[in-house]
Regions:
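Short beta-strand-to-loop acidic/aromatic patch adjacent to the donor-nucleotide binding site
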Residues: 148-159
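Conserved catalytic core of nucleotide-sugar-dependent glycosyltransferases
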Residues: 142, 161-229
Length: 229
């Protein structure tokens, strides 16, 4: 279901009809898709939550593991389970999913919503740390404690299509050095006066350009073993 919405949304983003764009028809359509997705995807997740294939298997690897890492804060934690669900449903499952939280914001795990805590049975690991490194938590602690593993950092407010990890791993094989890659890219766009336009108005790069410019990511970032952002 998520992949369907993703494909639908992307097809509208690539439309360039001047009149429809000026009338903001595409913006309205994209808004409707986002609303519909935010209503139906949670329902679908709840109805299929007991499917065993949507859990991490666990393994014997001690290094070279694929670790998905993220962090969050109180304003977003209630819907964070949806992000985790999308990660548990990947076509190429990670070995670990780690959520790093600050004790300044969550003094103990009991303060977290049940919807999130229940995901520990399916492979989610949650760690509390002193202080607050903000968004840097998701890679600082992972690099410190799992230096020999592959790290994929994700955000706490995005539904990730099932092919996310699979495509990142395939893309990483093209490069022999630590690199940040993504599936979608946007080019910084200016108006006629040279002023930078809002991000939502930046033009997406063509497929030919994407092969040359791989450091500007939109959805996720990927760091091979030993890599640093």
């Amino acid at each position: 279901m998520l992949d369907f919405y993703n494909s639908w949304y992307a097809s509208i983003q690539h439309e360039e009809h001047p009149f429809l764009k000026k009338m903001r028809i595409y913006s309205v359509l994209r808004f409707c898709i986002r609303v519909l997705a935010n209503i139906t995807i949670p329902i679908y997740y709840v109805l299929t939550i007991n499917n065993k294939k949507y859990s991490l298997l666990g393994g014997e690897l001690k290094s070279g593991r694929i670790i998905v890492t993220l962090t969050s804060f109180p304003a977003r934690v209630n819907r964070l389970w949806l992000v985790i669900e999308s990660l548990l449903r990947q076509s190429h499952k990670p070995d670990m999913i780690i959520l790093w939280l600050s004790k300044d914001q969550f003094s103990n795990l009991d303060l977290l919503p049940r919807s999130l805590l229940k995901l520990r049975k399916r492979g989610l690991q949650i760690f509390l740390r002193e202080g607050d490194l903000r968004s840097y938590k998701k890679f600082f602690y992972t690099l410190s404690e799992y230096p020999n593993d592959v790290m994929i950092t994700v955000d706490d407010d995005i539904f990730y299509p099932t092919f996310t990890i699979e495509e990142l791993l395939k893309e990483s094989l093209k490069y022999s050095f630590p690199v940040v890659v993504s599936r979608y890219f946007s080019a910084i766009t200016q108006d006629n006066l040279g002023n930078c336009l809002p991000y939502i108005e930046w033009k997406q790069l063509t497929d030919k350009s994407r092969d040359k410019i791989f450091f500007w990511f939109r959805w996720w970032n990927f760091i091979p073993s030993g890599g640093i952002v």
